[in-house]
């Protein structure tokens, strides 16, 4: 019986190579600015409007507790799509650079070692080696954590409420100014 192979898009973060299931990759985009939202974790950079869909953008370096890096011409955003609980989640992850696409069968993917309770390995799906490289395979389901997305939804709602309040206040002040002039 033939072993099923799965393709992974690999990318770089601080010199390490990571991979995500290519079936979860919607597209790869060059880095472009985002709309920042208030009251969000530092690794959530903000949101973009991609063909009418608002997509949260997460800096994977910061999410993994790595040192921040100034974005450059190699910095890309990988748009990931995942279906969970009858809900489609779409999130962009900012990475240093895209590397390659590799195929791995289940036999070549090793389980991530247990690091103890001090190290969070929940993102790890496994490890795969190709030639002399070790590639860290990420679990997209965990990467697209709904709790993080809830924080973004909440921040978006707060930003929308603040904008509405500002417009109402400006309208009220304008009416009051007109009434004073007409009096």
How should these model regions be labeled?
Residues 1-183:
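An acidic, low-aromatic, low-complexity terminal/linker signal
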């Amino acid at each position: 019986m033939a072993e099923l192979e799965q393709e992974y898009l690999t990318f770089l973060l601080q010199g390490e190579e990571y991979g995500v299931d290519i079936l979860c990759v919607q597209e790869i985009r060059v880095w472009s600015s985002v709309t920042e939202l208030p009251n969000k974790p530092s690794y959530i950079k903000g949101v973009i409007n991609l063909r009418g869909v608002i997509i949260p953008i997460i800096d994977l370096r910061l999410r993994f507790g790595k040192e921040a890096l100034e974005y450059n011409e190699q910095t890309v955003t990988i748009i990931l799509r995942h279906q969970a609980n009858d809900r489609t989640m779409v999130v962009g992850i900012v990475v240093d650079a895209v590397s390659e696409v590799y195929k791995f069968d289940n036999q070549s993917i090793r389980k991530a070692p247990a690091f103890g309770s001090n190290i969070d390995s929940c993102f790890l799906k496994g490890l795969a080696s190709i030639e002399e490289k070790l590639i860290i395979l990420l679990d997209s389901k965990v990467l697209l954590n709904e709790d993080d997305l809830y924080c973004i939804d909440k921040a978006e709602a707060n930003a929308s409420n603040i904008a509405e309040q500002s417009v109402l206040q400006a309208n009220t002040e304008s009416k009051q100014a007109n009434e004073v002039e007409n009096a």
